[in-house]
Structure formats: C-alpha cells, structure tokens
C-alpha cells in the first residue's frame, strides 16, 4: 500500500498495541482476530485516521463492502486530507457493483490525488490482495503511466507481490 501525507498521530499505549496486533493478525491472514484487536482501541481515539484506516483494511479483507463504504464515507468527512479513504470508498462501491457511484467518488477526489496515480496504485493493491491479478496489473500499469516513480514502489510493495511472482 502506498500512502501520501502519512503523518502518524500519537496514540495511547492501548491503541498502539491494538494497531500493532491487528496488523500482525492481518499479515497472518487472521482478519477476524485483527478486527477484535481494532475494536480494543481506546474509544477516544476511534476517529483518528490510523484507527479508521486499520479498521477499514480489516473490513476490506473480510469483504464487508457496505461497512467499508460507510466507514470510508465517514472518514472522508473527518479527514479529507487522507487519500486512502477515497480509495477505500471507491473500491467498496466497485465491489458492490455500484461502478457509477465509485467513479463519482474518484471524480470528486481532489485533483492532486487524481494527478498522482495514487488512486490506481492503491486499487491495484486491493485487487492484488483479493486475488484479481488481471485487474491489479491494469491498475498498476495506469498508475505507472501517470507517475513512473511508482514502478520502484510497486516492485517492493508486499501488497503487490502476486504481480511479480
């Protein structure tokens, strides 16, 4: 996954532990356990971007598209500067067969996000993680056409491993 403007916020020890544990569980393919860990974050920190992003990444792995879309829509309102939520919302809408709405989300994204290729890059990551290698290859190709520097990131990104093996 490639992020822009990633500036982590300080978290309580409880939330830091939950985020690290959830990431570990997700890496091991244990999405339900990861979701349990995210649920253990401090309530006062539940709307922080890193917590919202982590929760939505788990929901993506679980294929809970309606929840992904709703949480991403909320997160876009709370944190409009975070591009990841736009990508997540568009992807969830795409998976729910609401392509027109997905395109409207992408069209509504700030111009600077659309110019960087980050939307296509992150869509490639999601598709690769969910096993649609053909679509992932198309998305990463578009991203690289928009920004050649993404080629280097793509080759070392663990989310895109399936494209290069």
Language-model features, listed with the residues they occupy:
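TPR/TPR-like (Sel1-like) alpha-helical repeat modules
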Residues: 128-152
